[in-house]
Amino acid sequence: MNPKQGHILYLHGFLSSPHSQKAQQMQAYLALNFPHIQLHLPQLSGKPAQAIDQAERVFSTLLQQYQQEFLGVVGSSMGGFLAAHLLNTISAQPKAVLINPAVAPHRLFPDYVGEHTNPYTQEQFSLEAADIRLVEQRYIASIGQPQQFQVWLETGDDVLDYQLAQNLYKDSECHV
């Protein structure tokens, strides 16, 4: 085993995809600077229940397949929420980098109830009250192992309040 081999799971945000600018920039950066790191970019459903299930399955599979290699998680927006959920419920072994993570998406989703089409994949889905309740059940009020998280926050995000993330991850390495 080459100890430098590693894997990063990238979890995109709501109504996004592995084809988003952030995901593509990360893929290009790793290919150029860290070719020994394999980036895993699953396409997550817009439906929260399916996205959570997909993220859990991919994460668990990577943990099993690459037990002796580095595994990290990067999550952007809703993907940041999912990354925190994975580390808090399945395994806190990996480290995570969160980019403007959604902290309480169940508080934002009421504004998104209804029909949606993912602009990258053309997936059509409906966000319903049951989806919001499911996400609320996975709300994380405190971080068990804050040293596992590095958080990058942008103050000018139109949707996400960076101060919520700054407060939740106050004991983690945060960059505003």
Segments from the language model and where they lie:
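Glycine-rich phosphate-binding loop signature in dinucleotide/nucleotide-binding domains
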Residues: N2-P3, L62-E69, I90, G144-Q145
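Active-site catalytic motif of lipid deacylating hydrolases and related acyltransferases
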Residues: G6-E69
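Residue-level signal for short, function-critical loop segments
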Residues: F14, S77, T155
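Conserved alpha/beta-hydrolase fold motif
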Residues: G72-V73, A96
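Gly/Ala-rich beta-loop-alpha elbow adjacent to hydrolase catalytic centers
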Residues: V74-A83
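Active-site signature of alpha/beta-hydrolase-fold catalytic machinery across serine-
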Residues: H85-T89
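The alpha/beta-hydrolase serine catalytic core
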Residues: P94-V176
